[in-house]
């Protein structure tokens, strides 16, 4: 790949960017809806059920983030090969990310299915018997869905690498329709409670997986896998994918392990605190959907620019994407402050104590997100698109453990503070991440990395 920066015509016009990012916003909203729908509809069973589902979902996020990190590695490599006009290598990288994803997700599903009780006890310690019963039920079926989530994430990432985000959006739409419809039938119709929610999620993820794989095999797909023999390991491509995927996986994994460590603190504060934390977490995820979507799309835009050797365009698009992320974040979080928070919380069957806790958390979240969220989470994806994953990993891991986990344990165990201070630790982590990522971006060293 050439290192020269050129000033040729723009690689992406306005219509192409809109066509990429609008479906991504919809896809992210739909993706988050699965966890939110489960929590919302399970709330009719009671706070113990909500708490059980939320504890498992915190672990599920860890697994999904690890799988997504590997998909990110594949997307970055494929994007840069597309930008560099090497279609055969791009297709080969698609086959290798599928090989990696299938292997890892199947092994993970088996381990978690067999050891789910020990995992829950090890992470969350002593929790109410009802909460544990619900959690074990939800955990088993969640684990069975990991291979389908993994393959779906890989397929969706490959479509986005081509600049086609409509496929993953439509697949996510189908997944959510099946999930919500299944929840309604199994929870309300058959009274299956948590088991019904978990079953609906499993079936919906299976359908999304098969849909993406079918579309990936169409003749007009630039990254299709033509033969099963294409899945034969290619050590050179695996190394290139893992160069981005492993640091991203360690970053996401350690980030989620840190969150799990903090969740174990939350579980000591009582069922109301667990429920408030779960509901506020789900709602807050929705508020950052636009900025999150921009970060995902940045892997395609910045990756293709750098693959084509267009460093000037890469930096220009990066600034535009970051400003877009801030605009979306301000729109959503100001709406939350003025009316969305109370409206969303009213949908959940929370006790007055849990409702009050959740509302307080949301107000703080809105205020801090306006300043810190895009620079903490959208900006590092821009750096990863250039292959600068080792830097983002180092900053994220150190910041998580030093500023979030240590702070939370100190405030809760030493000073006996409540749930709000656990979220304060999260905000402190964001501030540190933002500082280092912004400095890295301004100095431009992130564009000196070599992926292909």
Map each language-model feature to its residues.
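Short alpha-helical transmembrane segments in multi-pass integral membrane proteins
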Residues: 1-24, 78-145, 189-246, 302-369, ...
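N-terminal transmembrane alpha-helices
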Residues: 8-40, 44-45, 61-73, 105-109, ...
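Transmembrane helical elements of multi-pass membrane transporters/channels
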Residues: 19-35, 141, 175, 204-208, ...
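Small-residue hotspots at the loop-to-helix junctions and early N-terminal turns
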Residues: 47-58, 135, 139, 198, ...
């Amino acid at each position: 790949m050439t290192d020269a920066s050129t000033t040729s015509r723009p690689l992406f016009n306005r219509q192409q960017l809109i066509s990429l990012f609008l479906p991504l916003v919809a896809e992210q909203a739909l993706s988050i809806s699965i966890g939110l729908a489960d929590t919302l509809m399970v709330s009719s069973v009671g706070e113990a059920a909500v708490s059980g589902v939320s504890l498992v979902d915190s672990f599920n996020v860890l697994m999904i983030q690890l799988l997504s990190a590997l998909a990110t590695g594949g997307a970055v490599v494929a994007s840069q090969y597309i930008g560099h006009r090497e279609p055969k290598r791009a297709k080969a990288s698609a086959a290798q990310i599928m090989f990696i994803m299938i292997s890892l997700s199947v092994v993970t599903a088996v381990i978690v299915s067999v050891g789910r009780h020990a995992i829950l006890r090890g992470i969350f310690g002593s929790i109410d018997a009802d909460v544990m019963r619900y959690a074990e039920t939800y955990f088993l079926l969640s684990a069975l869905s990991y291979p389908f989530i993994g393959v779906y994430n890989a397929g969706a990432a490959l479509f986005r690498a081509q600049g086609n985000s409509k496929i993953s959006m439509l697949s996510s739409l189908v997944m959510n329709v099946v999930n919500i419809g299944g929840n309604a039938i199994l929870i309300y119709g058959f009274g299956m409670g948590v088991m019904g929610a978990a079953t609906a999620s499993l079936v919906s993820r299976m359908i999304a997986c098969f849909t993406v794989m079918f579309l990936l095999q169409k003749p007009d797909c630039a990254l299709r896998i033509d033969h099963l023999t294409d899945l034969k390991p290619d050590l050179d491509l695996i190394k290139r994918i893992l160069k981005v995927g492993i640091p991203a996986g360690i970053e996401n994994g350690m980030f989620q392990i840190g969150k799990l460590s903090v969740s174990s603190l939350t579980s000591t504060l009582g069922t109301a605190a667990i429920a408030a934390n779960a509901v506020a977490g789900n709602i807050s995820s929705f508020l950052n959907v636009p900025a999150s979507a921009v970060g995902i799309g940045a892997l395609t835009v910045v990756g293709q620019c750098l693959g084509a050797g267009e460093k000037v365009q890469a930096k220009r698009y990066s600034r535009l994407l970051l400003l877009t992320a801030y605009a979306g974040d301000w729109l959503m979080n100001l709406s939350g402050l003025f009316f969305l928070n109370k409206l969303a919380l009213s949908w959940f069957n929370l006790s007055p104590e849990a409702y009050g806790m959740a509302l307080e958390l949301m107000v703080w979240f809105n205020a801090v997100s306006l300043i810190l969220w895009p620079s903490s989470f959208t900006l590092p994806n821009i750096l990863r698109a250039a292959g600068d994953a080792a830097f983002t990993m180092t900053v994220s891991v150190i910041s998580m453990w030093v500023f979030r986990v240590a702070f939370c344990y100190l405030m809760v165990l030493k000073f006996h503070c409540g749930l709000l201070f656990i979220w304060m630790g999260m905000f402190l982590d964001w501030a540190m991440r933002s500082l280092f990522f912004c400095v890295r971006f301004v100095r431009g060293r992130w564009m000196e990395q070599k992926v292909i």
